[in-house]
Regions:
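Conserved mixed alpha/beta catalytic, RNA-binding, or beta-rich assembly cores of soluble enzyme
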Residues: 1-63, 78
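C-terminal binding/interaction regions
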Residues: 60-69, 73-99
Length: 99
């Protein structure tokens, strides 16, 4: 449901352990300076059971790894506490791209 890229290279793809564990892989990041986080809906995903969600705690983790941009797909991601999320992104100069 999510991945992390640097430029045009995919560095990490979320697995069964979840988004937080994937982000934690970059907790000591010093090598990559153009990280992009992408949140998406899996093919044939059942919305009633598992819907892509992002909230302030995830964004705080992304801030720690110095993410430059976050890409979400319109009507495919639930944003928890949207106002706080947008403030966190703005205050940390993270670009939000909605496709």
């Amino acid at each position: 449901q999510s991945l992390i890229m640097n430029g045009d290279r995919i560095l990490a793809l979320e697995n069964f352990k979840g988004t937080s564990k994937m982000i934690d892989l970059f907790s000591n990041n010093k090598s990559f300076n153009e990280l992009i986080f992408v949140k998406f809906k899996k093919l044939n995903q059942i919305n009633e059971v598992d819907f892509p969600v992002i909230g302030p705690e995830t964004i705080k983790k992304l801030i720690k790894i110095k993410i430059k941009a976050m890409i979400l797909f319109k009507k495919q991601t639930l944003i928890v506490d949207k106002i706080n999320c947008l403030k966190l992104l703005k205050n940390n100069n993270i670009n939000l791209i909605v496709l």
